[in-house]
Amino acid sequence: MKTLLLTLVVVTILCLDLGYTLTCLTHESLFFETTETCSDGQNLCYAKWFAVFPGARRPDGGCAATCPDKVPLEIVNCCTTDKCNL
């Protein structure tokens, strides 16, 4: 009986989702950041800054499956650890 109970406990632990979930920063505005828990398949955090007008940049960021493409006047950084997209 103890063996059956131990087997059930081990099987339960193995069947649980013990995967790691990445957390990224989202940039709501220039000074306000919140966190976002990434969905399955989104294994990158990105930060994107682009010029609104000369001397001012607007931030964007969050979770992504692939690093976003860079366009002119834009800075894009991607990383793979929690809250790394400052």
Swiss-Prot record:
Provide the free-text tissue specificity comment from this protein's UniProt record: Expressed by the venom gland.
Does this UniProt record's set of keywords contain Disulfide bond?
Answer: yes
Q: Which SUPFAM superfamilies match?
A: Snake toxin-like
| Biological function | Binds to the muscarinic acetylcholine receptor (CHRM).
Q: Which CDD domains match?
A: TFP_snake_toxin
Q: Name one GO cellular component term.
A: extracellular region
Which family, according to UniProt? Belongs to the three-finger toxin family. Short-chain subfamily. Aminergic toxin sub-subfamily.
User: Which keywords has UniProt assigned to this entry?
Assistant: Disulfide bond, G-protein coupled acetylcholine receptor impairing toxin, G-protein coupled receptor impairing toxin, Neurotoxin, Postsynaptic neurotoxin, Secreted, Signal, Toxin
Return the Pfam families for the record. Toxin_cobra-type
How does this chain assemble? Monomer.
| Compartment annotation | Secreted
Q: Which InterPro entries match?
A: Snake_3FTx, Snake_toxin-like_sf, Snake_toxin_con_site, Toxin_cobra-type
Its recorded name reads Muscarinic toxin MTX6
Q: Does the keyword Disulfide bond apply?
A: yes
Signal sequence segment: 1-21
Alphabetically, the GO molecular function entries are:
toxin activity
Predominant subcellular localization, coarse grouping? secreted
Could you tell me which cysteines form disulfide bridges?
Answer: C24-C45, C38-C63, C67-C78, C79-C84
